[in-house]
């Protein structure tokens, strides 16, 4: 470990400092979303001194549901919930699941839309008792971090009833 310090310092001086300079030299961290961020890409940015944190949000509950930040982050996680959002994870019947179990991400808060413009049918399917059923698959960890795993509505069901996310299969194939 002690032998790595001089190498890291050398790489920082020759390479990483120039990358940071291309970002203006003042960037402390940045947050990405819109799709799941690649863990290796996140690790690269942490390594060069500009951490890339993953967040989660959607148009129907704008702008942010959860985010990692400098004080707490885990690769692969979408971070802690922003206040005052309520979040629960539900099964396909809408029953709340315990911490650690995967299901549909369901949110409630002042940021949740009232409904879709001139589309009461879609609104009734998506917003129930003030809760927005996002259609996204995820779980909450014991630490209170949200993990988004893919789309709940596009799950593949095996012959034994096990549910698989296409994104998880794609990730396994890429690795």
What are these regions (language model features)?
Residues 22, 33, 44, 48-51, ...:
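Generic, well-ordered alpha-helical scaffold segments in large soluble proteins
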Residues 167-175:
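Repeat-solenoid scaffold signature
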Residues 34, 113, 166:
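Glycine-rich phosphate/pyrophosphate-binding beta-alpha loops
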Residues 1-73, 86:
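Gly/Ser/Thr-rich phosphate-binding loop
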Residues 158-160, 166-167:
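Glycine-enriched catalytic-core subsegment of oxygenase/oxidase enzymes
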Residues 81, 88-90, 95-100, 106-158:
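Conserved ATP-binding/catalytic segment of the ANL
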Residues 17, 76, 121, 171:
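Active-site phosphate/pyrophosphate- and oxyanion-stabilizing loops and adjacent acidic/basic residues
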């Amino acid at each position: 470990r002690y032998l790595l310090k001089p190498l890291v310092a050398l790489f920082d001086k020759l390479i990483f400092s120039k990358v940071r300079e291309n970002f203006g030299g003042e960037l402390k961290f940045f947050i990405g979303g819109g799709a799941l961020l690649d863990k290796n890409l996140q690790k690269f940015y942490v390594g060069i001194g500009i951490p890339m944190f993953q967040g989660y949000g959607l148009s129907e509950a704008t702008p942010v549901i959860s985010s990692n930040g400098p004080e707490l982050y885990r690769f692969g996680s979408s971070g802690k919930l922003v206040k005052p959002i309520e979040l629960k994870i539900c099964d396909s019947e809408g029953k709340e699941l315990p911490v650690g179990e995967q299901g549909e991400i369901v949110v409630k808060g002042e940021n949740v839309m009232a409904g879709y413009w001139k589309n009461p049918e879609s609104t009734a399917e998506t917003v129930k008792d003030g809760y927005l059923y996002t259609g996204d698959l995820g779980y909450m960890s014991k630490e209170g971090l949200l993990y988004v795993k893919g789309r709940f509505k596009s799950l593949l069901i095996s012959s034994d009833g096990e549910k698989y996310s296409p994104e998880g299969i794609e990730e396994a194939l890429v690795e």
